[in-house]
């Protein structure tokens, strides 16, 4: 099980990562990582970066039947 400090350190080393990547790297359940990232965000230590729909290569994200599931969410240190 990872600690909040390990999540912060991993973000410091890698720059920016998705929550799923952090979960796999630290071998920690996804809901736990999500909670830790939200805690870091509320403390002002991490920031959530969401891709814009214009970044979609096919240009069809706005009408995506999966509800914009193709848009990625990254985390980085502040």
Curated annotation (Swiss-Prot):
Signal peptide (residue range): none
Keyword Transcription: yes
Residues where iron-sulfur cluster binds: 56, 61, 64, 70
Keywords carried by this UniProt record: DNA-binding, Iron, Iron-sulfur, Metal-binding, Repressor, Transcription, Transcription regulation
Pfam families in the record: FeoC
Family, as annotated: Belongs to the FeoC family.
NCBIfam families, alphabetized: PRK15431.1
Function: May function as a transcriptional regulator that controls feoABC expression.
Protein name (Swiss-Prot/TrEMBL): Probable [Fe-S]-dependent transcriptional repressor
Species: Shigella sonnei (strain Ss046)
Organismal lineage: Bacteria, Pseudomonadati, Pseudomonadota, Gammaproteobacteria, Enterobacterales
